[in-house]
């Protein structure tokens, strides 16, 4: 039996539905399984809507070999960059759980540490950016990283967040569509 259930609660939608339709202002954005929506969002709206905490959406300058976030260049393949040849800025999407503490990587000024037992959430801004880096509907938000650590960094510390380039989503700023 097919049932259509309408909700504004993403957790409800993700747990109750075999397929979920994400709409924005009455326009269908993407229809897929909950996991596919999470893993391969079609655009910035779906990326920012699905997941709790939400995907980090960070704007950076296109440079040789990748996208510059704060004081670090996240590697992005030439094939992906070629899909947005005229764009000087792209938006990178990184899920909080995709980060690891590392000796090299994206610099984070830790503002808040939320300890949850086996995991901790770090909230902060990118090193070298002079601003909070995550964006959603044009508003700045803190970057969130979920780390598995018994000894998380402390508030005020500066850490490096490693990320596997395969887990980075790249979005066009012109179209808001995912290009990676």
Annotate each language-model stretch with its function:
Residues 53-55, 65-180:
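Non-catalytic connector elements of ABC transporters
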Residues 1-4, 10, 87-89, 111:
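Alpha-helical hydrophobic/aromatic positions enriched in membrane-embedded helices and signal peptides
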Residues 2, 7-75:
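Internal alpha/beta loop-helix hairpins
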């Amino acid at each position: 039996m097919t049932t259509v259930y309408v909700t504004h609660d993403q957790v409800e939608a993700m747990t109750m539905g075999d397929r979920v339709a994400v709409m924005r202002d009455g326009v269908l954005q993407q229809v897929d399984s909950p996991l596919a929506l999470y893993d391969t969002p079609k655009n910035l709206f779906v990326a920012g809507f699905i997941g709790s905490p939400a995907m980090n959406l960070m704007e950076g300058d296109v440079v040789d070999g990748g996208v510059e976030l704060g004081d670090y260049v996240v590697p992005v393949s030439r094939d992906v960059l070629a899909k947005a040849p005229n764009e000087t800025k792209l938006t990178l999407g990184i899920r909080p759980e995709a980060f690891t503490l590392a000796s090299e990587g994206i610099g984070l000024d830790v503002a808040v540490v939320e300890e949850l037992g086996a995991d901790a959430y770090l909230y902060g801004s990118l090193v070298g950016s002079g601003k909070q880096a995550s964006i959603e509907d044009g508003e700045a938000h803190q970057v969130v990283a979920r780390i598995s650590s018994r000894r998380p960094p402390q508030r005020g510390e500066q850490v490096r967040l490693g990320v596997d380039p395969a887990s980075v989503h790249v979005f066009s700023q012109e179209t808001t569509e995912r290009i990676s």
